[in-house]
């Protein structure tokens, strides 16, 4: 008589279809915001709302680090469709997504109805992405590439302003979206 073994896999292996759809919709919304709303703030640079949307998606779906890294790389690829410094966003959005994935894993122990985790995590992740971007850009500039540097004070204003805007957007959207998705 033949004995059969049944193996069960516990834990999820990658993102579900609904998680992928959520990430796609939020990244698309971030691209639209970057294109239209970012134009209003244009001083040669545009705030990057794509960061807010990948932070929101990582906050809601809480992916593994490898999945968060892929979300960051996809966000970097989407940023390539917009004018600016090419290719740097691949690295900066990767770093921002990994930082966000790390921050959502910290056990904060808040049992309160209102949490500041979304606003704080998004602010820090946006800073990580922005500082990575400016660091790489200045390294490339000072290594002899033909890139015109924007004064550091302007970049700092853009990074801090974008971090603030992204943090507020994510804080406002987090609870309603989480409730709507029943997560």
PLM regions and their residue ranges:
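Hydrophobic transmembrane alpha-helices
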Residues: 2-59, 97-105, 174, 178
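Short helix-perturbing small/polar motifs within transmembrane alpha-helices
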Residues: 2-10, 19-25, 71, 91-138
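Interfacial aromatic-anchored transmembrane helix boundaries in multi-pass membrane proteins
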Residues: 32-46, 74-105
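Alpha-helical transmembrane segments of integral membrane proteins, especially early/N-terminal helices
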Residues: 45-57, 85-89, 124-128
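Hydrophobic transmembrane alpha-helices of multi-pass small-molecule transporters
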Residues: 52-56, 80, 97, 101, ...
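Membrane-helix interface "capping/anchor" motifs
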Residues: 58-71
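Membrane-embedded alpha-helical hairpins and interfacial helices in multi-pass inner-membrane proteins
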Residues: 87, 91, 111-183
